Amino acid sequence: MAESMKGLHRTHRCTELSNSNVGEIVTVMGWVQKSRNKGGIIFVDLRDRSGLLQIIFEEGDIGTEMFEKASKLRSEFVVAVVGKVETRSGAVNENLLTGTIEVRATELRILSESETPPFPIEEGSKTKEELRLKYRYLDLRRPDLVRNLMLRSKVATLTRQFLSDEGFLEIETPMLTKSTPEGARDYLVPSRVHPGNFYALPQSPQIFKQLLMVSGYDRYFQIVKCFRDEDLRADRQPEFTQIDMELSFVDVDDVISVNERLLQKMFKESIGIDVSLPIQRMTWREAMDRYGSDKPDTRFGMELKNVSELVKDCGFAVFTGALENGGSVRGINANGQGEMPRKKIDALIEFAKGYGAKGLAYLSINEDGTYKSSFSKFMTEEELSALVAAMEAKPGDLLFFAADKDKVVFDVLGNLRLEIARNLELLDKNTYNFLWVTEFPLLEYSEEEGRYTAMHHPFTMPMDEDLPLLETDPGKVRAKAYDIVLNGTEVGGGSVRIFQNNVQEKMFEVLGFTKEEAYERFGFLLNAFKYGVPPHAGLAYGLDRLVMLMAKEDSIRDVIAFPKVKDASCLLTDAPNVVDDKQLEELSIALAKKATEE
């Protein structure tokens, strides 16, 4: 039967006690991690969010009745204990913060009993994720998840402190807003008051933070929930958290400067990592040419080399055919992997096919300087030697080549270098390599839609020198956009915004909107631009992704208290769920019956 904690007040969390507290009478409360009855003495590991503390119940100290109560303790019982802090009489536990002390109990209250949990509540549980998420309230008791959520809280606190000290105002923007279809799908919320009309949950506070700049709030931030109805993967959720900011009277360098100092403070004070400033910058073009990715992982080399010029006249039709069709031939050097078994090479070729490759050409350099290759019979010895030299290869190396349109080649080799690095365990989670990627293309052409779409969003300012190209060659326009990349993951991104109405209208025109359509969707922003707009720019971090990397986790689900799974459902609450007909009727909604196959 549960007891009351009336008259008791917790004096310390478990790991707040140390040798300096020896001799003190304390009251601690928490969950029983485990209990060991040694006959006449019971050892209990008590756990709270701070960690573990050993409690001793000795029959000679507390009497038979309380000792019998202590003998009934099981894992996950919630208890309150009053006792005296002592130096450990037995062996010191070097693995615990409290490993040199223990509390000798004088009073015990069982505040709540527990059924046997469906899985062990312990560090590094091997329990299947589905079961852990179904019982997330138990999973969240595990020390590794406690550490992750404490880290997340610390990062949010440091962010608020830093930005407040830098003159930013924390301002909330609406959760119920207007649907402006462009990019990912919106989550829609039906209006009861306006039948047949819908709100959208915001994919970002983009428009509202720009309106705040128009309103004169020249430095804004918030830590905010955003929503996107898109397919999930390890680093995506339907609802996610952004550290969002916007600044007036600034350009690219100003935004980067503030954020470099924020990252430096955040990493130093939360996980003890020094971030060297300034952070390296690289244009989008250079990132693609060197790494095949606009979010390159720079913890290792294996950079792409363009060998198109070298092979344009060779006898290998795969290479020459790609070049004749306007593509390129590029390669990577897997240093020291010349003895890779054919089975592993074949697995890498299959991997590359998953990114659009028709195949991969490969060449290994034997220790005696001879070559073993899938295409050597089509090239002369001189051509092969020139190719090896261009790839800066030496005996024992293995080269892979892709030949196709640039988009395919970059996608294939960019992902192949990561796969090889994973296989060779080159991705050190204790290394944090930041990189700014700048000067993205403003637009990309959608063959499916037959029009240009914004690579970031339609409010991004073109590079000043590229403005005339909006009229003549929109595909070549570069954006004043910047992403912050950490270990191959984009953790934040932003841009300088368009602040002249004529440029914004031109941007919408290039995107295929008529003036009427642009005003229908974004009229409130375009109208605001008629009343004096400061130059402004901003950036948003994905807090979930950032903390995931700081915590050295592989999925953002491990740094979110109550995450969704890949089909966007919640295993804990069974959301989404069917609602009553009455609720639908109040919202003037009727569900269409799906046709079923007979």
From Swiss-Prot:
Q: Where is this region: Aspartate?
A: 206-209
Q: Where in the cell is it found?
A: Cytoplasm
Instruction: Identify which top EC class this enzyme belongs to.
Output: ligase
Gene3D superfamilies to which the protein is assigned, alphabetical: Bira Bifunctional Protein, Domain 2, GAD-like domain, Nucleic acid-binding proteins
Please give one Pfam family short name: GAD
Q: Which SUPFAM superfamilies match?
A: Class II aaRS and biotin synthetases, GAD domain-like, Nucleic acid-binding proteins
Which CDD domains has this protein been placed in?
Answer: AspRS_core (cd00777), EcAspRS_like_N (cd04317)
Q: Name one GO biological process term.
A: aspartyl-tRNA aminoacylation
Site entry: Important for tRNA non-discrimination: 90
Q: Which residues bind ATP?
A: 228-230, 237, 490, 542-545
- List ligand-binding residues for L-aspartate: 182, 228, 456, 497
Reactions catalysed, semicolon-separated, are:
tRNA(Asx) + L-aspartate + ATP = L-aspartyl-tRNA(Asx) + AMP + diphosphate
Q: Name one GO cellular component term.
A: cytoplasm
Q: How does it assemble?
A: Homodimer.
What does the UniProt record say this protein does?
Aspartyl-tRNA synthetase with relaxed tRNA specificity since it is able to aspartylate not only its cognate tRNA(Asp) but also tRNA(Asn). Reaction proceeds in two steps: L-aspartate is first activated by ATP to form Asp-AMP and then transferred to the acceptor end of tRNA(Asp/Asn).
* Protein family (similarity comment): Belongs to the class-II aminoacyl-tRNA synthetase family. Type 1 subfamily.
UniProt-recorded name of the protein: Aspartate--tRNA(Asp/Asn) ligase
